[in-house]
């Protein structure tokens, strides 16, 4: 059964398959390239950075905030990723929210995004984030439905983004 877990090197092969799927836009550290992560050592560096990013003193790009990164996996099969941002900047308040998520294209329309968001809410609550701001593009009907099914209450639209507050508890 798929579950949210901390990033792990155990899904390296499946992660590489996912990031090569057309339409998938993975996110990684500015100084790492996909070519670096095809090697186990480079991927281990990426995983370590993902895990360290939740710490306040971790190095990060300007404007970024501490975030807990989680991967949605079924055994060694990588399905998607989710990030919980520990606080909101003015930009995140308008555009990004507390939680951002992606499902690999070959696994979309199977309920994974809904399960990921549902499983992430207790993680957010443990971080003291309640309610959780989740945003989506105005035209992204599937994501809007995911947020609404999780109990998201629509607040407003800003800059082409729909903004919802989702109870974490």
Feature-to-residue mapping (PLM):
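GNAT-family acyltransferases
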Residues: 1-98, 105, 123, 155, ...
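Active-site acidic-Proline motif in GNAT/NAT acetyltransferases
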Residues: 101-110, 139
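Conserved acetyl-CoA pyrophosphate-binding loop and the N-cap/start of the following alpha-helix
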Residues: 107, 111-119
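Short glycine-rich hinge loops at helix-strand junctions in the catalytic core
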Residues: 111, 128, 151
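Conserved active-site alpha-helix within GNAT-family acetyltransferase domains
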Residues: 114, 138-156
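Conserved GNAT acetyl-CoA-binding A-motif
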Residues: 124-135
């Amino acid at each position: 059964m798929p579950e949210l877990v901390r990033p792990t090197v155990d899904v390296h092969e499946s992660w590489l398959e996912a990031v090569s799927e057309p339409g998938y836009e993975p996110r990684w550290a500015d100084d790492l390239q996909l070519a670096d992560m095809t090697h186990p050592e480079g991927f281990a560096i990426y995983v370590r950075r993902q895990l360290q990013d939740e710490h306040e003193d971790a190095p990060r790009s300007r404007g970024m905030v501490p975030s807990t990164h989680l991967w949605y996996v079924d055994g060694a099969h990588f399905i998607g990723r989710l990030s919980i941002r520990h606080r909101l900047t003015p930009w995140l308040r308008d555009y990004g929210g507390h939680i951002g998520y992606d499902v690999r294209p070959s696994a979309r329309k199977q309920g994974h995004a809904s399960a990921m968001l549902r499983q992430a809410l207790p993680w957010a609550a443990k971080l003291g984030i309640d309610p959780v701001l989740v945003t989506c593009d105005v035209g992204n009907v599937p994501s809007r439905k995911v947020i609404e099914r999780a109990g998201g209450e629509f607040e407003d639209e800003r800059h082409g983004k729909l903004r919802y507050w989702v109870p974490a508890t």
